[in-house]
């Protein structure tokens, strides 16, 4: 959500920032609605004030024996009581229209975000690791996986397209990866482990900018709750409508949860394999910080996500997203893309975003700076540390052997009960 004062103070700069994201100008429309809203609010407040004054004056007139004046004041109060409900309704409606108009405007990019139209304009800002040289032609995970317990047929039979049933060693490796990620973020980077609900109300989805813009990308239950598309929703919204102590910041939260996405906009993409699923697990990172610390926290969070890939010895590149490829609520985003030798391509495995106070305004999350009476909005950040399913894919493709087996990364040995290889079944 945007600060209306920012638009009032410099509408041209606001529209110019939106134009960098390929968005049409909206300042004039927003300010016209804002002017209507303020005019009606003023009118309503004046009517309320006059009603109170006139009501008080009735008693004074009666005490002075001025019946005629008292009757006139009573008539005025009666008129105001009829007028006020209409003004109050109009005030509520205009405020709702203004909020709805602001709610669908994306966040403004920071100055150091490159301009661009789509992912082809993203900038590579770093790489890590050495791509393995194979003595055989590496295969894709969708070809290797079935013999190792990645059962696409049963998943589809049970639930339809984009669902997978993991068995045996494959299921254990998937679990090991998630536990390793969670343990690392807690022990190495000081994130507090959480186990949040995966069903949330509208308010949590709205506060984390998933509604109303992306309703079709999420699953809703019959009672109106939403299955979380990411634990970002539950973790970030945990401070909704709160005023935090300055000493409580930074607040770093992590959770390993199932996530659910309808993938409405992904028709025809990654229809094969385990890359794009309706249900998947992810180790989510959320930071809630003072405004002056959000830029440094963004770098720290991205480093935390990178550390998992480095520990697993998975080659990757770090991309700074351009204005045209950033998510709706982000003002700056880094994507980590892991190398998949079977596909011969880098694929996104983590996205770390700084949203500034964009989400905090939507969910009214504030803190009280030490020694000050006034509160201020916090800044929120979120990132994947990492997507478990895609990491499983990366391990399969990077650690595959010619016989169809897959070696287990050394750091996962404590989680695998000593099993250091997945062997194909005949």
Curated annotation (Swiss-Prot):
Keywords: Aminoacyl-tRNA synthetase, ATP-binding, Cytoplasm, Ligase, Nucleotide-binding, Protein biosynthesis. GO terms for cellular component: cytoplasm. Disulfide bonds: none annotated. One of its GO terms (biological process) is selenocysteine biosynthetic process. One of its GO terms (molecular function) is serine-tRNA ligase activity. PANTHER family: SERINE--TRNA LIGASE, SERYL-TRNA SYNTHETASE. Consists of two distinct domains, a catalytic core and a N-terminal extension that is involved in tRNA binding. This is Serine--tRNA ligase. It comes from Erythrobacter litoralis (strain HTCC2594).
């Amino acid at each position: 959500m945007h600060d209306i004062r920012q638009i009032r103070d410099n509408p041209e700069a606001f529209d110019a920032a939106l134009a960098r994201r390929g968005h049409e100008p909206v300042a004039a429309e927003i300010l016209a609605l804002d002017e209507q809203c303020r005019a009606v609010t003023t009118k309503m407040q004046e009517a309320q004030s006059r009603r109170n004054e006139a009501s008080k004056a009735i008693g004074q007139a009666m005490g002075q024996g001025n019946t005629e004046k008292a009757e006139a004041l009573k008539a005025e109060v009666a008129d105001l009581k009829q007028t006020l409900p209409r003004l109050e309704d109009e005030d509520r409606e205009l405020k709702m229209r203004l909020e709805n108009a602001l709610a669908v405007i994306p966040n403004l990019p920071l100055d150091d975000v490159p301009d661009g139209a789509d992912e082809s304009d993203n900038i590579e800002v770093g790489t890590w690791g050495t791509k393995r040289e194979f003595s055989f032609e590496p295969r894709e995970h969708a070809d290797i996986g079935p013999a190792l317990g990645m059962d696409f047929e049963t998943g589809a039979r049970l639930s339809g397209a984009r669902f997978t049933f993991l068995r045996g060693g494959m299921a254990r490796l998937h679990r090991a990866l998630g536990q390793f990620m969670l343990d690392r973020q807690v022990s190495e980077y000081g994130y507090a482990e959480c186990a949040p609900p995966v069903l949330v109300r509208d308010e949590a989805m709205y506060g984390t900018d998933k509604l109303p813009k992306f309703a079709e990308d999420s699953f809703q239950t019959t009672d109106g709750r939403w299955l979380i598309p990411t634990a970002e929703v539950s973790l970030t919204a945990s401070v909704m409508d709160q005023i935090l102590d300055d000493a409580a910041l930074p607040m770093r939260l992590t959770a390993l949860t199932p996530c659910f996405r309808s993938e409405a906009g992904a028709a025809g993409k990654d229809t094969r394999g385990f890359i794009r699923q309706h249900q998947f697990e992810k180790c989510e990172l959320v930071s809630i910080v003072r405004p002056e610390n959000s830029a440094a926290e963004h770098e720290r969070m991205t480093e935390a996500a990178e550390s998992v890939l480095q520990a697993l010895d998975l080659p990757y590149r770090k991309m700074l997203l351009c204005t045209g490829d950033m998510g709706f609520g982000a003002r700056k985003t880094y994507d980590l893309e892991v190398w998949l030798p079977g596909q011969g391509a880098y694929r996104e495995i983590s996205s770390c975003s700084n949203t500034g106070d964009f989400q905090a305004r939507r969910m009214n999350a504030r803190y009280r700076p030490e020694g000050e009476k006034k509160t201020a909005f916090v800044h929120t950040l979120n990132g994947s540390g990492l997507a478990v399913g895609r990491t499983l894919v990366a391990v399969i493709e990077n650690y595959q052997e010619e016989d169809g087996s897959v070696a287990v990364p050394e750091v996962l040995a404590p989680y695998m009960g000593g099993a250091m290889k997945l062997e194909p079944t005949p």
